Amino acid sequence: MAKIFHIAPYIKPDQEVNAMKPLDRFKKFRDDYVICQVEKAKLPDFEDDYFVRRRVTFSGRVQHVGFRLELEQMATRLGLTGWVKNLENGDVQAEIQGYESRIRYLLKFMRSLKRIKIEKMENKPCSPKQKEEGFKII
């Protein structure tokens, strides 16, 4: 194992994945899969409606499955702002800001994912933030 790290600086880019630890390799493949799924998802035509901010807490199988990355990628694609984070109790919490129809689509999209099992979703309104940019995983 030590030799892999010793020679790692000398490997070619296409060999990087093979030189990774198995868990890191799995995470990279999972993350690449998540990004690919979000990029190929067909988005509906949205009619811009109310601009809102929601605090959403997701319970179920939502950690260690690429949930935060998928939410962040899709929120960014939808032009939403905010953040998403893991909670110590195993839940995931997000604050999502943007047009209501886009937030509804994002939540429906997340519920549709097979590797994720949302057992409970608590959705509460909160005050919009001025000049917020981007969507972050924290």
Stretches found by the model and what they are:
Residues 2-138:
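Intrinsically disordered, low-complexity, mixed-charge
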